[in-house]
């Protein structure tokens, strides 16, 4: 990626009220995006948001900027990120814009774009928008100003799309499901999808008030879901994050089922049904148990850098259709164009219904390896600890001891002066000792 001033790997994000997430910046961003996208001939942009209180302010600013550039805004209201990608495709809009900071707290927000085909904007278009941001705002003639309107049936359209990814011959009528919508964008979507497919649904995290998104609920904190699954004696629980592009599940015993396990279930079911094309893409953080379980099934596996953008790039490079991060981003290119928590969850439920198996039993073919992560802070003026001979020597010793049944990953944080030390292997006590041994070597530099 080139050096950019505003766009990161997942759009523009920050604390509301601090640059760049301010009304004046977002208005100019809307104008700049409008100027660039108008060159492609379309005059409409889909705008969706999650449930953060700042979404109202930011969508108004975006709409004003787009209108000044001559483009019309179609508002969806609170809507999952993948729903905006879907609606952008079906409306043939020039682009879709999502106002969300995903799994972050309510006081953060962000802006990300989808192109006409429901994928992330190409780098060249993002760069053109940044170049336009350096110019003074100008307004089109009054007769050419953009308008604003609402897509009144946006939720219903997306609910039907999600249901269409679940096999017609199957039903969820045997299942009692607790669904946790993180007080986020799936609150009025996911429970209805599951109920309409026949499930007995208990909904939590479905009372957004603008400031409670991701607050001790959702895919990043499943404790409330685990407790409710056990209390209700439910068959399973499903948690989404604030914008609905991640899913984490909980089995009937209260065990967390992460993105690695979800991908394993979906890939194995695809193999059984003769529908799996190629292999599966994980990340550097994917559990070694996933790699070994897929290998046992004869399914090729490749690792991408951490980030759903890089997972998708690796999938496209290899021509494969399934990819996931252990955090719960699951990308199924046969079904949709981006990570979609509801669609991924439905594929696991289809495997349960088709095989008459519990979520717990579907996971049993994959043994999760203990994965110990230690963060070590360092000072930038002491040089790169990863290049130090003592750190390299200790790392080599640990790798030799683990052999082919474990691995070591050392990487720098992209946002703080931290070295992340990850050691994975079959024996938890051993890998814990190894992780701290390497961390001590990093600290000593």
UniProtKB/Swiss-Prot annotation:
Top-rank lineage group of the source organism: Bacteria
Classification via NCBIfam families: glmM, PRK10887.1
Cofactor binding note from Swiss-Prot or TrEMBL: Binds 1 Mg(2+) ion per subunit.
Entry's family note: Belongs to the phosphohexose mutase family.
GO biological process: carbohydrate metabolic process; peptidoglycan biosynthetic process; UDP-N-acetylglucosamine biosynthetic process
Source organism: Escherichia coli O7:K1 (strain IAI39 / ExPEC)
One GO cellular component term noted in the UniProt record for this chain: cytosol
Key words of the record: Isomerase, Magnesium, Metal-binding, Phosphoprotein
Modified sites of kind Phosphoserine: 102
Biological role: Catalyzes the conversion of glucosamine-6-phosphate to glucosamine-1-phosphate.
Chain residues that bind Mg(2+): 102, 241, 243, 245
Residues at the active site: 102 (phosphoserine intermediate)
HAMAP family: GlmM_B
Signal peptide stretch: none
The gene coding this protein: glmM
SUPFAM superfamilies registered for this protein in UniProt: Phosphoglucomutase, C-terminal domain, Phosphoglucomutase, first 3 domains
Modification after translation: Activated by phosphorylation.
Pfam families: PGM_PMM_I, PGM_PMM_II, PGM_PMM_III, PGM_PMM_IV
GO MF annotations in UniProt: magnesium ion binding; phosphoglucosamine mutase activity; phosphomannomutase activity
Protein name: Phosphoglucosamine mutase
Lineage: Bacteria, Pseudomonadati, Pseudomonadota, Gammaproteobacteria, Enterobacterales
